[in-house]
């Protein structure tokens, strides 16, 4: 039995890898730059976490969202794996302290946003770390043709100059051929091994419902499926109004949109993650990296901006492999 499989069983309690997790892990362990295009819920995180545990040193994870970083760090810590994140609310003194601890080998995973790489002093400190792998979350953000372009992602390629022999692993769930090529070019990946998996999610059922009364229809759906749900709307006003209407009907709902203060976003997210709120009513600000296995229903009551957003948002459902809508 491989060491990678033993770690999967020990920390994640899964008996076997999904296709093509094991091949991706081996590619990284062989020192290759690697690009993984896997569907939402396809187990992308394990593809960098396991090789990072097998290699000496620390894994640097570049991630676009505070909520995503905190969720992954908490997930690793719950498995007794030492991880830390440089999030926006961390002071400069705390950053220095965290980086010192990374240098002394007290952490296996360091998460940070791409914007942190715009600070020269942080990059200088990173150069002193024994980095064994650089993992890029939501890699489509590096492409101007992607649906969530973040200019700061273009700074990641500079790490290649400092760590020419350290493997890069770029991961995303949404990238057409043009975006894939852009990712590999903009991240300066060297002869990357490319892995893709079918985007068919057998456990997801898609429905288009015609109705004159959306709220009544939502009430029916949520009553029939009382498990965790997400409702996507196009703007903040609809977000607040829909949540208020649901609460008046006796459902427990909370909201998430770009205009909320960070603390309120975190509080609402936690309420939903802990199933204190059945329904999260959200704009597309609530999207990348949200990994809650038991989401039963994702409802779009207004059209999303594009098909990529729809695929990502609908893909929040059924990550535990059970039937979802």
Model-based region annotation:
Residues 6-11, 15, 19, 23-35, ...:
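Helicase motor core with emphasis on the C-terminal RecA-like subdomain
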Residues 1-4:
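Accessory DNA-binding and partner-docking regions appended to nucleic-acid-acting proteins
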